[in-house]
Amino acid sequence: MPTFRRGDVVKVPFPYTDRATRQSRPALVVSTARLEEAHALLWVLMITSADNRGWPGDVDISNLAAAGLPIASVVRTAKIATIESADATKLGKISAKALKQVSREIGRLVELE
């Protein structure tokens, strides 16, 4: 049985392409339960402070308390990683409206829409 669902906000060791280290940070689960059930993996998008310079495709997180986030944050749809589900800790979840917007932005990036 999967532990995580699309739309969950998790804390994970997010990898960086420009460093050999990983930093523990919030991320959004965008994969379906099938990936976790078959391979114990999650596809996640970076969540970053809304104070950082915005990127095209960023999605605001409106309900910080429900997402388990302490400060204004955005989902950075251009930054995706594959994480072992055992390394993730659930913090909360984003709204259905925000998840739909994230899905639309991902679709644009991979030309599904």
Specify the residue positions occupied by each region the protein language model found.
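C-terminal terminal-subdomain/extension
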Residues: 2, 64-113
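Compact nucleic-acid interaction/catalytic patches
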Residues: 20-24, 29-63
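Short, charged beta-turn/beta-strand-edge "cap" motif at the junction between a beta-strand
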Residues: 15-19
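An N-terminal domain-cap segment
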Residues: 1-3, 20-21
